[in-house]
Design a protein with these regions (language model features):
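A cross-family signal for N-terminal binding/gating loops and helix N-caps
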Residues: 1-296
Length: 296
């Protein structure tokens, strides 16, 4: 009898990972990273530029084209206390594109750093965006699990919420890097094919691809398709429960074009998902399809 996955102990997934084995910064040329090969029971190493040589001709590769947003907003209180408001998911409006286009007001579900210091309902910060001086106000609303509803308001209709994030926000890099965000991260912590803004973390399996690797894949006859999954708060939220059942999972936004779905259905060869975000999008797509077929 298979074990109920809800009762799997988190401790079974613990393993040592020395800090010195974690690269704090990427290589100057991202496709020169190491490539681990497991083939016919043998393990070997290569460089990432060699990837096309290991993949079957005629394969279909699926990439996640999400783009990381500068989701960390910092407010300094008069007492000197620093409070971080980490934007996770748009609430009003709940569509990412519409929310980024908002002027004057937008609401997000946020994680709050140093919450105990946020005693008044509102935080304010003055800034200059696109040459306009504005005052950004953050009002804390109801608590939803470990997150809070936060209303953002500003006093200039020429400025969008996307503008505010671009100027005021900080890119969220993984906590295991144990370093502050740097200006170079705005480029290196994005995939070269990132397009659709919305993630709070990069789909890291795609970070090693470069235009020359993508060109080499296509030259071999490998078809490239894209979908979107905006990586959510689960990336940063530690697992504190002893069993999987006790861990709160966050939902994530996905979008797959009709043309991509048709290619997936019609494709008879090998389908290769780049990273776990692409995998769980495809798994969710299948689940949604089965559910709709059974309950039209």
């Amino acid at each position: 009898m298979k074990e109920d996955p809800r009762h799997i102990h988190i401790s079974e997934y613990s393993y040592p990972l020395p800090d010195e084995r974690i690269a704090k910064f990427p290589l100057p040329t991202r496709d020169q990273s190491k490539l681990l090969i497991y083939r016919r029971g043998e393990v070997s190493e290569d460089v990432f530029t060699s990837l096309p040589g290991y993949l079957p001709q005629g394969s279909l590769m699926i990439f996640n084209n999400t783009k990381v947003i500068q989701a960390r907003l910092h407010f300094r209180k008069e007492t000197g206390a620093l409070i971080e408001v980490f934007c996770l998911e748009p609430i009003q409006p709940n569509d990412y594109v519409l929310n980024f286009q908002q002027t004057v007001h937008a609401a997000w579900l946020c994680m709050i750093g140093n919450l105990k210091k946020w005693k008044d309902r509102q935080l304010k910060r003055e800034m200059t965006v696109k040459g306009f001086p504005i005052t950004l106000t953050a009002t804390r609303g109801e608590c939803k699990g470990t997150s809070h509803w936060v209303d953002f308001a500003w006093d200039n209709p020429e400025v969008t919420f996307a503008d505010i994030l671009e100027v005021f926000g900080e890119l969220p890099i993984p906590p295991y890097l144990n370093r502050d965000t740097e200006e170079s991260d705005k480029e290196t912590y994005q995939t070269v094919y990132s397009k659709i803004k919305g993630s709070v973390a990069a789909p890291t399996a795609g970070l090693h691809f470069t235009p020359r690797v993508l060109d080499a894949l296509q030259e071999k006859g490998i078809n490239l398709e894209e979908l979107t999954l905006h990586v959510g708060a689960g990336t940063f939220k530690p697992v504190k429960s002893e069993e999987i059942e006790g861990h709160e999972m966050h939902t994530e936004y996905i979008s797959v074009n009709r043309s991509t779905i048709k290619k997936l259905i019609d494709h008879d060869g090998c389908a290769i998902a780049v990273g776990t975000t692409s995998v769980r999008t495809l798994e969710s797509l299948y689940h949604i399809g089965v559910t709709l077929a059974e309950n039209p």
